[in-house]
């Protein structure tokens, strides 16, 4: 099976208001704009016991094993949404990490949107938003 290719665009916060804070996430209001800078995500189903997630590119060095993409798949597994499907994901990073451009968040959001729109997973928009909020404050901002 060949890889599918997804562009995961950076986002720019034009205005940001933190409404409330918790230990892990902030409740925010934001005005965003997507920019032409993007990471490239390659994804395909595989026969494996686990998902294979890898990052490469100039801005991949500091990405650890616990990241927004691995967190997304952990949530999908725990909610039994994937139904034992496994994926290989290769992400070429062009968006600098820790730069406020939402690179990691947008990677997870792009994958979630892809899986839903291609009907690889059966999920309603309301559930997608709940999952997005578990991963990051700014994920629910994306156009799921």
Task: Enumerate the predicted regions with their spans.
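Flexible lysine-rich "adenylation lid" loop at the C-terminal edge of ANL adenylation domains
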Residues: 101-103
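Conserved small/polar residues in nucleotide/adenosyl-binding loops
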Residues: 142-144
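Short, small-residue alpha-helix embedded
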Residues: 105-119
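ATP-binding N-lobe of GHMP and related small-molecule kinases
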Residues: 1-99, 116-123
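Predominant activation on well-ordered alpha-helical scaffold segments within soluble catalytic domains
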Residues: 70, 109-113, 129
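Short, well-structured alpha-helical segments that form the helix of a local strand-helix-strand
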Residues: 124-135
């Amino acid at each position: 099976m060949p890889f599918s290719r997804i562009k995961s665009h950076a986002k720019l916060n034009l205005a940001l208001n933190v409404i409330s804070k918790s230990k892990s996430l902030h409740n925010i209001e934001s005005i965003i704009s997507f920019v032409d800078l993007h990471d490239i995500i390659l994804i395909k189903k595989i026969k494996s016991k686990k998902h294979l997630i890898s990052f490469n590119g100039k801005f991949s060095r500091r990405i650890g094993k616990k990241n927004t993409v691995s967190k997304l798949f952990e949530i999908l597994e725990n909610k039994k949404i994937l139904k034992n499907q496994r994926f290989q994901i290769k992400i070429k990073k062009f968006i600098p990490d820790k730069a406020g451009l939402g690179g990691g968040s947008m990677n997870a959001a792009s994958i979630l949107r892809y899986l839903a729109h291609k009907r690889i997973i059966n999920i309603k928009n309301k559930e997608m938003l709940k999952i997005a909020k578990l991963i990051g404050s700014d994920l629910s901002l994306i156009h799921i």
